[in-house]
Amino acid sequence: ILDEESTLHNCDNPEDKVNDGSIQFDNVSFSYIDDKEKECLKNINLNIPSGSTLGIIGGTGSGKSSLVQLIPRLYDVTEGSVKIGGVDVRDIDIYTLRNEVAMVLQKNVLFSGTIKENLRWGNKEATDEEIIHACELAQADPFVQTFPKKYNTYIEQGGTNVSGGQKQRLCIARALLKKPKILILDDSTSAVDTKTDALIRKAFKDEIPDTTKIIIAQRISSVQ
């Protein structure tokens, strides 16, 4: 594995900025292997205006995660194109692209260190005020305030000393600190109760209206 080279490369003279958070899928097909008979996505056409919210619900293995992983170019499409801000993602500098797209997965990772240190992986220049605000939006601040050391509380490797729902909310806050143009939540509130889930969605609507939000969920209430 260490000797393998990535198949994802910048084109010559890539774009160094993302114009906005609009997303367009043009006749997209995708397969993890070079076999058209085993495509997990086929002929997908999708237009997501900048600042809008899209909810995606589907069974396990239906291609939900594969779809959104094409947006930050974790994989390249087999056919068709994915555009952000009107530009094909293959024509945007990979670092620039991924800096403008934040993804929060169902099983995200916390590292050993304080809560502040973990959150600054999203933005190493984030101020204490920005950290608290991001946690307020993600509904993490209420439980952080109950810890004796609050934001200086030490998190064990893998976040083993916080609950699954607390871990997910901290990971959402970390993504918000990037101030991305596109925010993707891939079943990342699955361990959060429905009331808190609703508060997170309301905060997104009120506080980050210009951010394009894609929410993948198992619960219908999570995308309403």
Locate each region found by the language model.
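ABC-type nucleotide-binding domain
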Residues: D3, T7, C11, D16-Q224
